[in-house]
Amino acid sequence: QSLEWVNRWFGNHRSVVKAILRVTGKEKKTWHIIDLGCGGGDLALAVAKSLSRHKIECTITGIDGNANTLAYAEKKCAAFNEISFLQADILDNQFTIQPCDILISSHFIYHFSADVLVDFLRNNLPAVSTAIIFSELKRNRFAMRLFKFSSFLLPISKLAKEDGLLAIKRSFSEKEWLAILQQAGIGTYSLQSVPLFRILLTSYPARKI
């Protein structure tokens, strides 16, 4: 719930939804979206609501390794038949996603090391027909200091504060993202800095440079 509050009030959901809308455009189809590391389902729910308002049909599969978190997500999203959830160990090197149109993730990719992320992208690119959209923290010293001094003012749990610091420490810089994308063989992408201290990656695996 703490992470949901942060994502909502700091605009993370909005930036991901806007990126999805740019990808879908006016094409009439049912888009299959996979939410990697979906947590409590707040991003999947925000996406489903927004696409519904824009009269865009979709199915969303949220994937996470925590059974308790998924139970919470299923309860919260019960009224949305287009959302389903799957429990899986995403960090297992044998894990692969099912075919989808769009792969999204928010505040999860920092769990990967750079080498493992490169392998994950290489192994899963063939399953994504249209776009990959990741919204992640961008590592820098100022973000670390600001979070340390301001987190006590935020209505979030101690666990969420600790997770936030860990996420900043383990997140990738823009330079590291460029190296990861090159090694993964992704040539068509955009890296956009968005508030606060985040990177929004939109990549198009099927497009040629």
Residue ranges and their predicted role:
Residues 1-18, 23:
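Class I SAM-dependent methyltransferase Rossmann-like catalytic core
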Residues 34, 40-42, 47-92:
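Class I SAM-dependent methyltransferase SAM/SAH-binding core
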Residues 104:
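A conserved beta-strand element that flanks and buttresses the S-adenosyl-L-methionine
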Residues 108:
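Hydrophobic adenine-recognition pocket in adenosine-nucleotide-binding enzymes
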Residues 112-124:
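A short, conserved alpha-helix within the catalytic core of class I
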Residues 128-137:
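Conserved beta-strand signature within the Rossmann-like core of class I S-adenosyl-L-methionine
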Residues 137-181:
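C-terminal alpha-helical "lid/dimerization" subdomain adjacent to the S-adenosyl-L-methionine
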Residues 174-204:
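Conserved Class I S-adenosyl-L-methionine
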